Amino acid sequence: MCTAMRRTTFTRTFVGGTLSLLAWLLTSVSCHAQDWGGSIAAVSDYVTRGLSQTRGDPSLQAGVHRTFPHGWSLGAGAATVDLGDWIDANYELNLNVARTWTLGERWSAQLSYTRYIYPDERGDHDYGELAGSLSYHDLLTATIAYFRHVSVYSRGTTAWSAEAFAIELSALQPVSERWSLLGGMGYYELPDPFRKGYLFWSLGLAFSWNALQLDLLRIDTDRTARQLFGTDRAGSRWSAALMWKF
């Protein structure tokens, strides 16, 4: 039996994590087994869990995915990043495996694992993300994500190869054939020795025309994130993305 599903693309500008993010630029995946798809995008500011991965600069991103019977899918992606001199990484790669279940006519669930790789980094910044999500009509999605071997650097505090988690709530509301409203918020519990976390949220518009999609988002974080990471990575910012889906 065919399992209908919708996938997030590799770009993660919206609320972040594995959603993310544009983390809520959704591509429809047909029910035919072993389908290929993908996207190429230019993003004005690459943001994950409220933090800029390019320090406010643009990012080029690309991703491909393949769906299989019974709700399985595989994906891979790449993006340009600027994580600062202490990491010195210019590229981010990811590999993803996911399983999606339909739960009646209204609900669906997904479990995924993503490995993030920084091939030219200083040190070992690679990490894994295990995420589970529950969606209602593909309009409202709740996600919890667990991060293993993640490293976080801030002003005066460093977590090296530690564990962290995030929770996110995302909404997608079509208002016409081409326009949709996007919104979301989440909480990221930072790894030890931070002993704290921060809130992040976003609101925006998406316009789609054939294989093209244009998004404009307003993203913000709470004061804790701004104090830890500075305004070049955290705080209020605009992010726009132009994507071609194939």
Q: What does each of the following model-derived ranges do?
A:
Residues 33-84:
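Short glycine/proline- and aromatic-enriched beta-strand/turn motifs that initiate or cap beta-hairpins
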Residues 125-190:
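Detector for outer-membrane/organellar transmembrane beta-barrel domains
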Residues 1-35:
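Cleavable N-terminal export/targeting peptides
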Residues 36-38, 70-76, 105-111, 138-144, ...:
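Repeated loop/turn-to-beta-strand initiation elements of outer-membrane beta-barrel proteins
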Residues 44, 66-68, 99-101, 107, ...:
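Residue-level signature of outer-membrane beta-barrel architecture
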Residues 42-48, 78-82, 115-119, 136-138, ...:
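Transmembrane beta-strands of outer-membrane beta-barrel pores
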